[in-house]
Amino acid sequence: MEFDEIKKHSLNCNADVLSSLQASAPASSPHTVTLKVNAVAEATITEKRNQQQNVQKDFDSHNRDCDSPVSSTSELEKEFDDLRNLHTSSLTNSVVLGKSIGSLNGDYSVTSASSRTKTLENVVTIDSASGSTCLAIASPVDHIKKRIPNSRTPTRKALRIKFYRNGDRFYPGITIPVSNERYRSFERLYEDLTRLLEENVKIPGAVRTIYNMCGKKITSLDELEDGQSYVCSCNNENFKKVEYNTGSQPLSNLTLTNNSRSNNQRLAKCRPASPLKNGLLTGISPLPASGGGTGNGSPLIASRLSDRVSVVHPRIVTLIRSGTKPRRIMRLLLNKRNSPSFDHVLTAITQVVRLDTGYVRKVFTLSGISVVQLSDFFGSDDVFFAYGTERINYAEDFKLEAEEYRAINVIRKTMRTAGTTCKGPKPKMPIKSKKVYPPLVDSEVLKAATSPEDDSHATLLTSTGIEINELPLNIRNTYTLGRIIGDGNFAIVFKIKHRQTGDSYALKIIDKNKCKGKEHYIDAEVRVMKKLNHPHIISLILSVDQNTNMYLVLEYVSGGDLFDAITQVTRFSESQSRIMIRHLGAAMTYLHSMGIVHRDIKPENLLVKLDEHGNVLELKLADFGLACEVNDLLYAVCGTPTYVAPEILLEVGYGLKIDVWAAGIILYILLCGFPPFVAPDNQQEPLFDAIISGIYEFPDPYWSDIGDGVRDLIANMLQSDPDVRFTSEDILDHYWTIGNKGNDL
């Protein structure tokens, strides 16, 4: 009796289902058998599909856990083909149902083991020549699962290798990951090392040889060891056994990846904290480093660190580059950031002078004395010759030509103090600007007042053109209005008092109508002040924005501004000036660390707190109307003429250091009572020409009793070249600022 061929799309059945079909076949007619088989098939199809989906999901999850899905799939397909061939050769008159487990598309197929069977895709075929059916299901899923790991198969970890430049004991080296996957050949490693070294140092050619630290030549990647250091040689140079800079930085801090092409770590050092920040000047010892170990706390190391701190201070040195006369002359700012050791100073000099022979190896003073230790750079000499590996002619090299001598004198022009006497009358301070207020308001405003207090408020506001009803309600109800304590181009400042606590504050009213097109300055001032929290910066208590005015409630300082204090006392002592420059330097350092430039530092914007004898106790920086965040060079010409930096006038772009220039002008004024750059009748053009020239003096008799330390600080703050001008941190680190420990804080 022949059976009808049963077709069902995507039908997957097991031996039990086929057995039930066989058992019912003889007792039923062909049509009945077909109906029963269909019923059974329909009842089980949903269950079988769910099982198939679960198997596929389980297999896909294992595929994702494998490191290489493609390679894993190909291996599984190969294994399944072997199993299928094995069943094909051993089974006869049977149906083999196979699922292509290794296939990424998840298709299913049914294959016949013999020519005596009928084969249809996605169809179960029953042999009509025999009364029974032998079904063999070749499903290697269980066997394959055993071979799939439960976690990701680890790949070979890349080696972290540090490479030095052959014969260069100053170069700190670069660290890169090295693996067979990244570098298929040794030549590829040579090319990458050549590129990386060219970005950091000057090399004579391409890298052609790699040595270990003992001088053994490395010929394959397998010879490299993880965490070890090696030496790169260009143009097949012989190995040079020198003391390489192995202690410059930890290996973990010097990793270079393919995407970091500019990771020059030679000067990427953490700047030591200023003595004004770490407690050295207050008698409070800094906290010890975490870990409690004794290795870094030995008396020997502590004494070395103490000596280094006492030796290194910010200063500008003049460098003469070796070569054909007249030789190039340049300047370099040395400070704790780039001069923690003798080798670091040589590295900094190398980057400035750029010798044809590579690194600077020898440095001499102007008199031909060799510089051999760190303290030599911070002694009495400030002009140095820089040499590489070239031969030195001691008889001729240390003689300056006339042109070289003139160039050095031009650089030293700001230090010309000897024999200079002020001719004519004493220079005067610029006039403090006064605001011309608008005309009085209508008399109806005065009649609207309902109390004597309101009458006084209205009278006061009338003189400024502001109506009492314009004040925000929360300010009017919380504070009582006092006298005018300051004014500017767009704003008026009142003293106000809290009604409940009696504390004094300052109310700054900014007239929006007078700064049309410059509203962004107002927004910037509020935005910047909300970010600030420093003891030497005025705090913002409250801000209220209205259509016509912006109202700012600020911290109040009782002594008024520094301009009025200078007018009263004319000049301050070095001790008093030191206090003020410390506080101003600390405020600028805080601002600059946040990438904010003030752009209008002047005595009118510095508020002071005085004692009963008129001595300055505290200084605070105020008025952030021109302050902004620095993301790139700025070009807007702004500020006050007397305090504006030369790069602003030249419109070549400026940054944070314009604040340092302004602070240098203020320090000069504090000590003598007038600015270094003046012009007759306060004319701007001659004044700007003087600022751009950078030439000023310390004339007698006004400077005859002032020490060289503060003159040196001023000279470094008033450098026309921003690259060598002091930073705000350098001001705090200067030996004059640090002096007189106990009494000036």
UniProtKB/Swiss-Prot annotation:
Residues 479-737 form the Protein kinase domain. CDD domains: DCX1, DCX2. Keywords: ATP-binding, Kinase, Nucleotide-binding, Phosphoprotein, Repeat, Serine/threonine-protein kinase, Transferase. It holds the Pfam family DCX. SUPFAM superfamilies: Doublecortin (DC) (SSF89837), Protein kinase-like (PK-like) (SSF56112). PANTHER family: SERINE/THREONINE-PROTEIN KINASE (PTHR24347). This is Serine/threonine-protein kinase GG21441.
